[in-house]
Amino acid sequence: MNKISIAVIGAGRIGAFHAKNLASHHKVKVKTIYDLNSNSAKKLANVLNSNVADNDKEIFEDKEIKAIFICSDTPSHIKYLELSHLYNKHAYCEKPIHLDINVVEKFLKKIKNHKNSIQLGFHRRFDPSHQKIKKILKSKKYG
């Protein structure tokens, strides 16, 4: 069975969280990890049996990689989203895209006709309804 090759940019807490979840899926191969801190990238790559990119562009130029998980610092998100657009990759980006709404609006206009998916991670773990469900589940009242 062919696996989809994915790269993760950012090997910190959230990058490692996503990379490990992705690697647990039978149809996914976390092929490459990139982080400005090469030690963090190497540590995560060792756990996942992945490659480490020497630079960010290496990920985008790799034709096997179909999707990019952007888990780096917020100021770099637009750069990596634009590269995803340029290299025609699917992208998942941690929130926020950028801190300046004008930059976000300009980017959204630029990618209006992007052929692949771009998804923004917007977890709701602090949403009151999610907190209530979590509390109920932990109580084991319903199984």
Predicted regions and their residues:
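Conserved SAM-binding strand-loop segment of SAM-dependent methyltransferases
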Residues: 49-56
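N-terminal Rossmann-like dinucleotide-binding module
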Residues: 1-48
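Acidic-histidine catalytic/liganding microenvironments
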Residues: 25-26, 62-63, 127, 139
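Short amphipathic alpha-helix with an adjacent loop that forms part of the alpha/beta core around
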Residues: 56-64
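Local beta-strand N-terminus motif with an aromatic residue
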Residues: 30, 65-68, 142
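Beta-strand-loop-alpha-helix segment that lines the small-molecule cofactor/substrate pocket
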Residues: 67, 73, 78-122
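Predominantly a Rossmann-like dinucleotide-binding segment in NAD(P)-dependent oxidoreductases
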Residues: 124-143
